[in-house]
UniProtKB/Swiss-Prot annotation:
Belongs to the SHE9 family. Homooligomer. This is Sensitive to high expression protein 9 homolog, mitochondrial. One of its GO terms (biological process) is inner mitochondrial membrane organization. The gene is SHE9. It comes from Candida albicans (strain SC5314 / ATCC MYA-2876).
Length: 524
């Protein structure tokens, strides 16, 4: 009935749509009616055909996106699953799933082998560490036992008034010189009081040892030292008191140098760089620990994934044979379904821990890199500062050397020369005055030479040192005169004007600084 009503409505709609064009034809309107009908049909085709083409194109794209072999393993209906698995498509899907499972198993097996190897290495390390700890504990126990034995031996010596000592083998040796009264029973059962001096080798309970065991280790050591001469211990014993004092002084000097070096590092700022180095080493250790933690988190995450995948695989296997379940299978399915949520939570927690560990590794790595860059930058600044300080120190030393040269040449040497000359003249005058009048004729020629007569030409002993002139020829003549005066043995004094002395000192200083700069630039 509904279908009939729909068809009737469709016919009415078509009748209304094409009613103007379906009127009885007349001779006058036939051509116009045909033209309008053809126009309507063309317009409908133009507007409807693109929509159909778009719909067809979308359907083709949707069909091309579909996989050739759908994943029928996700179908939960057992009957439909059984029908599909009986066909070729279901078999191919199962084979694909089996190949993926085999690949996962291989990867998990490789990961498991690698983890087993790492665990074996860790186990060996733990065994080695435990062995070392047991050996150290054994050594400590032996030391405690020896200490206890020594205390006990001291008490016995104090009690028995004897002198016992312990041998290398752990036994006691000594000499009991105490005089005691000993009761001896003879065959006639007579008691005799005897006094004896006993020399024994005994334990703390006065039990006699087999023999007096010598200290073999010391004897062997002495024999080796006698056979092989020049050992360090022998040299140390044979050193004189002066050599020992010298060694002690050198050790103290070494400590002083270390203290001075530490103070210099504090002043220059290198101690902070040393602290930065130690912090970098600490960060490297932290990075190693963080990487070890990431490795452990990866192992835990892999185990969680393996546990959950194994549980899901077992659930899928139970679902494949759902139609013939037993009571044990039902209980197992219930248990697996109940544990699946816990496995998922464990997997999420392991993944979260792994992400946190990896982020921590990234943070530590970034901090370590930044610390290394900071250390490099600070060391560069420190080296530049030291280089700059050494350059200024070199210039200061050069200036001091030039100043000392100028002072020694132009102040100290003339003063020393004048003092020597005056002292010599005074000495000569004293000798001349003390000579008797008998030798007056012999000393007259000498006096005449020292005090020339008025008719003689005086010998010039001083020279006015000048080299500032206005012309080139005058400068050359001044240089020649100055050179002749410097080379003449009769000239003993040089005289400078104040301006010329300042100019000469400045010239010498500039030449010295230039030579020093050239030497520093060549050997830097």
């Amino acid at each position: 009935m509904n279908l009939f009503v729909a068809l009737s409505k469709k016919k009415k709609y078509q009748h209304k749509l094409f009613a103007p064009y379906l009127r009885p034809s007349t001779d006058t309107t036939t051509t116009e009616t045909r033209f309008m009908l053809s126009t309507c049909l063309i317009r409908n085709c133009v507007f409807i055909r693109p929509r159909l083409s778009v719909i067809c194109f979308k359907a083709i794209r949707y069909q091309s996106k579909k996989s050739d072999f759908p994943d029928y393993t996700k179908i939960n209906d057992p009957k439909l699953r059984e029908i599909i698995e009986g066909s070729n498509f279901g078999t191919e899907a199962i084979l694909k799933k089996q190949r993926e499972d085999q690949d996962k198993k291989k990867k998990m097996e490789q990961e498991r082998k690698r983890l087993e190897q790492e665990r074996e290495v860790d186990r060996r390390r733990e065994e080695k560490r435990a062995k070392e700890e047991s050996e150290s504990n054994k050594t400590d126990n032996d030391n405690e036992a020896n200490q206890h034995t020594d205390d006990k031996l001291a008490k016995v010596n104090e009690k028995l008034e004897s002198n016992f000592s312990k041998t290398e083998s752990g036994k006691l040796r000594g000499e009991d010189t105490g005089t005691r009264e000993t009761v001896v029973e003879t065959e006639e059962e007579e008691e005799l009081k005897l006094k004896a001096e006993n020399k024994i080798i005994a334990t703390s309970k006065d039990s006699v040892d087999e023999s007096d065991i010598p200290n073999l280790a010391k004897e062997i050591n002495e024999t080796i030292q006698k056979e092989i001469a020049g050992l360090p211990s022998q040299k140390a014993k044979n050193q004189s008191k002066l050599a020992k004092n010298l060694t002690k002084y050198l050790d103290s000097a070494h400590d002083t140098i270390l203290t001075a070096t530490r103070a210099l590092n504090d002043v220059t700022g290198y101690s902070a760089i040393e602290k930065l180095k130690k912090s970098i080493e600490t960060q490297e250790d932290d990075l190693k620990k963080a990487k070890e933690k990431v490795k452990q988190c990866k192992i835990a995450y892999g185990e969680a994934i393996q546990r959950r995948s194994h549980s899901q695989r077992e659930v899928n296997e139970l679902l494949t044979r759902k139609h013939n379940w037993s009571s044990n299978d039902l209980e197992r399915f219930t248990e697996l379904y109940r544990n699946d949520h816990e496995n998922e939570i464990h997997e999420q927690e392991a993944e979260k821990k792994l992400d946190e560990a990896e982020s921590k590794v990234d943070g530590v790595q970034l901090k370590l890199t930044q610390s290394i860059l900071t250390r490099y930058h600070e060391e560069q600044i420190w080296s530049d500062k030291i280089r700059r300080s050494s350059t200024w120190g070199t210039w200061v030393l050069m200036g001091l050397n030039v100043l000392l040269f100028v002072v020694a040449t132009f102040i100290v040497e003339p003063w020393k020369r004048s003092k020597l000359v005056s002292a010599f003249e005074d000495k000569v005058k004293q000798v001349l005055v003390g000579i008797s009048q008998e030798n007056e004729q012999i000393l007259d020629p000498i006096i005449e030479k020292l005090e020339p007569t008025d008719g003689q030409v005086p010998i010039k002993t001083s020279f006015d040192f000048k080299f500032v002139t206005n012309t080139w020829h005058g400068l050359k003549a001044a240089l020649v005169r100055n050179y002749e005066a410097l080379m003449s043995p009769e000239i003993t004094n040089l005289e400078f004007d104040k301006f010329e002395f300042e100019l000469f000192t400045m010239t010498v200083a500039i030449v010295a600084f230039s030579m020093g700069s050239l030497i520093v630039s060549l050997f830097k």
